[in-house]
């Protein structure tokens, strides 16, 4: 009997010694280390208006059952999904916190994101408000410098940078203004000579001495030094009420005139031929060396060497935006792919942006217009330095709606939104973006 009591006593003592280890082992299994990542590094820098996709990644296979999510931005709850799309509306530091509940356990992960203004540099040529002079604004290092050039004609259309100067075209006098980029002072201008009711359209530099000014009354030679209007190009004598785009290649000058294309030899600006295909906007030179224009639901491809052309019908009732009054063309070419960008115009305004793959001839939506907004001016420009696509959108409506204008910057390959640049607060009516 004593032996039995002794054995029970020993087993009891052994159980007391082993129990802490068993308890500790179970505790370790029930409370595993949970690692949470959000798909972006803590302290990352993004652009204002950049779309950031955050995804809850729980690096622990022991989490079972229902998982509840709660995303917070600067302490405010914003989503209960496993993924969250973040966009900074203004520059500053944002604290993003993800709270997770699983089997009554709570886990949390917080990171900081720094939002900056998009670090780009470009000029915007503004039409001006309701018959008032146009102007040029500059965006640089996240800051706007307004009306750096302002003594322009009414309804300015384009700005062409050449060396240390920028040439700005306006529909009304002065039709062409030459300004220094170093201090933005106007050094010369062309104020007359376009004929009855003549208006400026566009401008092209031919060489160090000569440019071409396209107008409603035909295309004129321009002497650059000093800035003076020369003679009208051949085969332009009877042109009236025209809308003229222009593009220079190595051997030829292409001018959209009277809804066709007139081709001039670049060496002496003599008339070469007319391409009879109907054209309503142009031009864009793609990576395969072809020159493109458009006519509503058709793209027109021209070989800039042989001058042969062909039409390509767009599918799915797509229509390229073409304004009834002259605006610079929004048909643009990618610098990284053999592709074109254009704004689809289901009604009267350009909205969503489409991308035409020249190799496959497939057309896909590239960027969806913001709700209740439409493109303005040329609407599309491609940054020649990095291939980003810049889109100008203005709120639909009249009057004060035009105060709400934004410039969207998207990746030229994927269409991913990289930034939104605020262009509100004034009746700018932006016509084009010009890169230096």
What are these regions (language model features)?
Residues 1-8, 14-51, 103-122:
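Bacterial Sec-dependent N-terminal signal peptides
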Residues 49-60:
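A short beta-strand segment in extracellular, disulfide-stabilized domains
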Residues 62-70:
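Solvent-exposed loop segments of extracellular immunoglobulin-like
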Residues 69-87:
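Surface-exposed, flexible coil segments in extracellular/virion-facing regions
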Residues 130-137, 174-178, 218-222, 260-263, ...:
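Structural motif
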Residues 142-152, 185-194, 228-237, 269-275, ...:
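A short beta-strand motif characteristic of beta-propeller blades
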Residues 153-163, 196-208, 238-250, 277-289, ...:
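Repeated scaffold domains used in trafficking and secretory/extracellular systems
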């Amino acid at each position: 009997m004593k032996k039995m009591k002794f054995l029970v006593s020993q087993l009891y003592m052994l159980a007391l010694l082993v129990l802490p280890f068993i308890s500790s082992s179970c505790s370790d299994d029930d409370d595993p280390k949970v690692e949470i990542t959000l798909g972006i590094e803590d302290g990352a820098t993004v652009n204002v208006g950049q779309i950031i996709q955050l995804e809850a990644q729980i690096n622990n296979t022991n989490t079972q059952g229902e998982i509840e999510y709660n995303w917070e931005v600067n302490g405010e709850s914003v989503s209960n999904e496993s993924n969250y799309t973040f966009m900074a509306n203004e520059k500053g530091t944002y604290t993003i916190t993800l709270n997770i509940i699983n089997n009554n356990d709570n886990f949390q992960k917080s990171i900081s994101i720094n939002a900056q203004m998009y670090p780009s540099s470009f000029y915007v040529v503004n039409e001006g408000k309701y018959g008032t002079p146009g102007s040029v604004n500059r965006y640089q290092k996240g800051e706007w410098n307004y009306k750096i050039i302002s003594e322009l004609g009414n309804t300015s259309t384009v700005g062409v940078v050449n060396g240390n100067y920028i040439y700005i075209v306006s529909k009304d006098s002065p039709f062409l203004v030459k300004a220094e980029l170093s201090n933005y002072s106007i050094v010369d201008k062309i104020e007359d000579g376009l004929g009855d009711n003549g208006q400026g359209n566009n401008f092209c530099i031919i060489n160090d001495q000569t440019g071409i000014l396209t107008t409603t009354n035909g295309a004129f030679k321009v002497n650059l030094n000093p800035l003076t209007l020369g003679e009208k190009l051949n085969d332009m004598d009877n042109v009236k009420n025209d809308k003229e785009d222009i593009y220079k290649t190595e051997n030829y000058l292409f001018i959209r005139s009277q809804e066709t294309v007139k081709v001039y030899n670049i060496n002496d600006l003599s008339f070469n031929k007319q391409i009879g295909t109907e054209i309503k906007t142009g031009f864009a030179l793609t990576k395969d060396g072809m020159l493109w224009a458009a006519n509503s639901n058709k793209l027109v491809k021209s070989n800039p060497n042989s001058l042969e052309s062909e039409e390509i019908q767009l599918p799915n009732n797509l229509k390229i935006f073409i304004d009834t009054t002259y605006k610079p063309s929004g048909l643009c070419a990618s610098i990284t792919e053999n592709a074109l960008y254009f704004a689809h115009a289901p009604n009267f305004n350009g909205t969503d942006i489409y991308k035409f793959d020249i190799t496959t001839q497939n057309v896909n939506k590239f960027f969806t217009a913001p709700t209740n907004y439409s493109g303005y001016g040329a609407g599309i420009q491609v940054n020649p330095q990095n291939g980003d696509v810049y889109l100008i959108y203005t709120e639909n409506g009249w009057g004060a709606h035009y105060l709400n204008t934004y410039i969207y910057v998207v990746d030229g390959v994927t269409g991913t939104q990289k930034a939104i640049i605020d262009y509100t607060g004034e009746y700018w009516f932006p016509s084009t973006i010009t890169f230096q």
